[in-house]
Amino acid sequence: MGIHGLAKLIADQAPGAIKEQEMKNFFGRKIAIDASMCIYQFLIAVRQDGNVLQNEDGETTSHLMGMFYRTIRMLENGIKPVYVFDGKPPQLKSGELEKRGERRAEAEKLLAQAQEAGEQENIDKFSKRLVKVTRQHNDECKKLLTLMGVPYVEAPCEAEASCAALVKAGKVFATATEDMDGLTFGTGVLLRHLTASEAKKLPIQEFHFSRILQDIGLSHEQFIDLCILLGCDYCGTIKGIGPKRAMDLIRQHGSIEEILDNIDLSKHPVPEDWLYKEARGLFLTPDVVDCSCLELKWSEPDEEGLVQFMCAEKQFSEDRMRNGCKKILKSRQGSTQGRLDSFFSVTGSLSSKRKEPEMKGSTKKKLKTGATAGKFKKGK
């Protein structure tokens, strides 16, 4: 879900913090990509006659086709992508996940009605609402990325939080996702539409977090409180407080606690057992991948492995797979003259513990590494 209305609010209040870019402008950049968001996009967009692509066994293959070609497109533009997969969702997200389940159940009813009435437009609409990224989708994409020579990371919790940690640690330049909560987790740069279909011709939006805070006059903690007021995945919101009012209240009072002391709670009731403090803590000190022990390597594709997996098992065209491998190899040759930051290597080990930066008091947190030895092929 992300943060309700945040993109528009930033566009209104801090337009100078947003740049419109073309993909070629990120040549030589390492970019952490929210994998689940990408796979969801592919399942929605990569279709034939309104239906997801399938192989002869009836297995969905839209996610694989999307992942293969969109990744190649980035590589051809000199980008070094690293995909970050979600881990276990935080307990605070259970309410949001329950709501999503209710919306799916409603969509199933509406789909059945549309099918009975033969309303193709509604059939397409409600079918897309039922799209869900499964563990099998994730596992197949991880296998594909390994065969393509592209690294991936398994986050211990929310992918966007670990993407932000990679940016903060200087391992990558930006987080690529459609959800704005990457900014709430503190990513220095957030990119939207990087993995969108080329046919849509959407410019890539580049958000700069420090400029956002500067232009709206808030600290990171105040920005987090603003996002909670707008609406996030982890708790409810105060009734009757829209985006502009939320911004005004945070600027005036500085925190949710002070706002609650200064508004009419009979007109603006708060949710029962409102867990805004817990949500704030999750944004400030999330469970993230240990960047100090992470090794990211981009290597040559395993052409025969790709043909076996994508052609023999998934029934893709062998010619297209081999042509794709040629494009990957060519992109590797072209990317040797990259940006200065591409010449620095990252070293790591299998597991470790680290402390989150101290933000309020001294909070110690055990963190799990998202990289294991089998997930990255050795580069030349």
From Swiss-Prot:
One of its GO terms (cellular component) is nucleoplasm. Residues 122-253 are annotated as: I-domain. DNA binds at residues 47, 70, 158, 231, 233. Keywords: DNA damage, DNA repair, DNA replication, Endonuclease, Exonuclease, Hydrolase, Magnesium, Metal-binding, Mitochondrion, Nuclease, Nucleus, Phosphoprotein. Binds 2 magnesium ions per subunit. They probably participate in the reaction catalyzed by the enzyme. May bind an additional third magnesium ion after substrate binding. GO terms for biological process: base-excision repair; DNA replication, removal of RNA primer. Its cofactor is Mg(2+). GO terms for molecular function: 5'-3' exonuclease activity; 5'-flap endonuclease activity; DNA binding; magnesium ion binding; manganese ion binding; RNA-DNA hybrid ribonuclease activity. It comes from the Eukaryota. Residues 336-344 are annotated as: Interaction with PCNA. Mg(2+) 1 binds at residues 34, 86, 158, 160. It is found in: Nucleus, Nucleolus; Nucleus, Nucleoplasm; Mitochondrion. SUPFAM superfamilies: 5' to 3' exonuclease, C-terminal subdomain (SSF47807), PIN domain-like (SSF88723). Its EC number is 3.1.-.-. Residues 1-104 are annotated as: N-domain. Mg(2+) 2 binds at residues 179, 181, 233. Residues 348-380 are annotated as: Disordered. Phosphorylated. Phosphorylation upon DNA damage induces relocalization to the nuclear plasma. HAMAP family: Fen (MF_00614). Structure-specific nuclease with 5'-flap endonuclease and 5'-3' exonuclease activities involved in DNA replication and repair. During DNA replication, cleaves the 5'-overhanging flap structure that is generated by displacement synthesis when DNA polymerase encounters the 5'-end of a downstream Okazaki fragment. It enters the flap from the 5'-end and then tracks to cleave the flap base, leaving a nick for ligation. Also involved in the long patch base excision repair (LP-BER) pathway, by cleaving within the apurinic/apyrimidinic (AP) site-terminated flap. Belongs to the XPG/RAD2 endonuclease family. FEN1 subfamily. Interacts with PCNA. Three molecules of fen1 bind to one PCNA trimer with each molecule binding to one PCNA monomer. PCNA stimulates the nuclease activity without altering cleavage specificity. This is Flap endonuclease 1.
